């Protein structure tokens, strides 16, 4: 297995890992240490050995403090990039840093050719600290503090989004060389779990005035951006949004503006079947509306597509209560921590038991009686309830509960409420080769 080679965008994963981890700049190590992760060792293993790897980490913790931890499977990231390049070869991914800014994850994406969209000065600083050049960053926040615009000008981030008159004036004043993408509101948000339309995007009647204002301010509008919303959106929403973007291109040409050369189709991609149907819809719409634009650069802002399935969270049972047939468990992470995704991202989490203390011979308790169970987070707020009426085998304090698919809007959006420090959760690195 050590000699196995997987090619991603012409890169050898062994070389990627060396440049990502072993050859990381000091700033990467500093960022990792700041996040409670001082080890950058990558463990190669087979795809079906991820649980064994987690058990080995847990075994090391049995005599010490049993803190939650993540495992990042870099092999999954490689597989996802392969899928992207096959399905959307002409669409360049700009990873949405807000989704999960884990440093080794970002470095891996960068090594495979991904660029980045940032929403704030802090995110730009973080990406730059990893040795990524400012030319690979889009400041994709339509409403920015003036201080952040000044910073973007200083460090050379020269592409941003706008959807209001005031934003044009701020950019004209503080960063006049910055090129603009007009953010438009899709008329169909695709029933996304997290729609973006209520907050961002120019309405149809606002597009011409916003183009005119930018033109009068002598700013360059290089293209159009949109976002259909995040999480399980209807892929057909891309069809209408791309058609609307084409109309903006035509309007700008009618006004005598510089030829637009960038189309940003936003995010909303989820790995699996949704991505397949979304990619088909995107390619169909691009063929219909932009087939005669050979100079056009098409970009997207995937976040959860790359992050969600690459991370697995391990938590410890710190308390238990029995009420008849009901089992109630307390774990050491919850809705104020990594599981904030249940509230704010409308996620559905699944739990897998690892009876590392009570049943080491049968870790997953296969064949055991199942009990209706409630799983609480560690804080004193009753809202901090991760799962209700969830059937799991009988578990004990110091057993573990594993949560797969925990990479999207989890640790990145957690808090330190009640003194439970989400930012201190360690991430261990693995590279699982396909079975």
Curated annotation (Swiss-Prot):
<keyword id="KW-0663">Pyridoxal phosphate</keyword>
<feature type="binding site" description="in other chain">
    <location>
        <begin position="344"/>
        <end position="345"/>
    </location>
    <ligand>
        <name>substrate</name>
    </ligand>
</feature>
<keyword id="KW-0210">Decarboxylase</keyword>
<dbReference type="InterPro" id="IPR022643">
    <property type="entry name" value="De-COase2_C"/>
</dbReference>
<dbReference type="InterPro" id="IPR002433">
    <property type="entry name" value="Orn_de-COase"/>
</dbReference>
<dbReference type="InterPro" id="IPR000183">
    <property type="entry name" value="Orn/DAP/Arg_de-COase"/>
</dbReference>
<dbReference type="InterPro" id="IPR022657">
    <property type="entry name" value="De-COase2_CS"/>
</dbReference>
<keyword id="KW-0456">Lyase</keyword>
<dbReference type="GO" id="GO:0004586">
    <property type="term" value="F:ornithine decarboxylase activity"/>
</dbReference>
<feature type="binding site">
    <location>
        <position position="268"/>
    </location>
    <ligand>
        <name>pyridoxal 5'-phosphate</name>
    </ligand>
</feature>
<dbReference type="Pfam" id="PF00278">
    <property type="entry name" value="Orn_DAP_Arg_deC"/>
</dbReference>
<dbReference type="InterPro" id="IPR029066">
    <property type="entry name" value="PLP-binding_barrel"/>
</dbReference>
<feature type="active site" description="Proton donor; shared with dimeric partner">
    <location>
        <position position="380"/>
    </location>
</feature>
<comment type="function">
    <text>Catalyzes the first and rate-limiting step of polyamine biosynthesis that converts ornithine into putrescine, which is the precursor for the polyamines, spermidine and spermine. Polyamines are essential for cell proliferation and are implicated in cellular processes, ranging from DNA replication to apoptosis.</text>
</comment>
<feature type="binding site">
    <location>
        <position position="409"/>
    </location>
    <ligand>
        <name>pyridoxal 5'-phosphate</name>
    </ligand>
</feature>
<comment type="similarity">
    <text>Belongs to the Orn/Lys/Arg decarboxylase class-II family.</text>
</comment>
<protein>
    <recommendedName>
        <fullName>Ornithine decarboxylase</fullName>
        <ecNumber>4.1.1.17</ecNumber>
    </recommendedName>
</protein>
<comment type="pathway">
    <text>Amine and polyamine biosynthesis; putrescine biosynthesis via L-ornithine pathway; putrescine from L-ornithine: step 1/1.</text>
</comment>
<feature type="modified residue" description="N6-(pyridoxal phosphate)lysine">
    <location>
        <position position="98"/>
    </location>
</feature>
<feature type="binding site">
    <location>
        <begin position="301"/>
        <end position="304"/>
    </location>
    <ligand>
        <name>pyridoxal 5'-phosphate</name>
    </ligand>
</feature>
<feature type="binding site">
    <location>
        <position position="381"/>
    </location>
    <ligand>
        <name>substrate</name>
    </ligand>
</feature>
<keyword id="KW-0620">Polyamine biosynthesis</keyword>
<feature type="site" description="Stacks against the aromatic ring of pyridoxal phosphate and stabilizes reaction intermediates">
    <location>
        <position position="227"/>
    </location>
</feature>
<dbReference type="InterPro" id="IPR022644">
    <property type="entry name" value="De-COase2_N"/>
</dbReference>
<dbReference type="InterPro" id="IPR009006">
    <property type="entry name" value="Ala_racemase/Decarboxylase_C"/>
</dbReference>
<feature type="binding site">
    <location>
        <position position="230"/>
    </location>
    <ligand>
        <name>pyridoxal 5'-phosphate</name>
    </ligand>
</feature>
<dbReference type="Pfam" id="PF02784">
    <property type="entry name" value="Orn_Arg_deC_N"/>
</dbReference>
<comment type="subunit">
    <text>Homodimer. Only the dimer is catalytically active, as the active sites are constructed of residues from both monomers.</text>
</comment>
<dbReference type="InterPro" id="IPR022653">
    <property type="entry name" value="De-COase2_pyr-phos_BS"/>
</dbReference>
<dbReference type="GO" id="GO:0033387">
    <property type="term" value="P:putrescine biosynthetic process from arginine, via ornithine"/>
</dbReference>
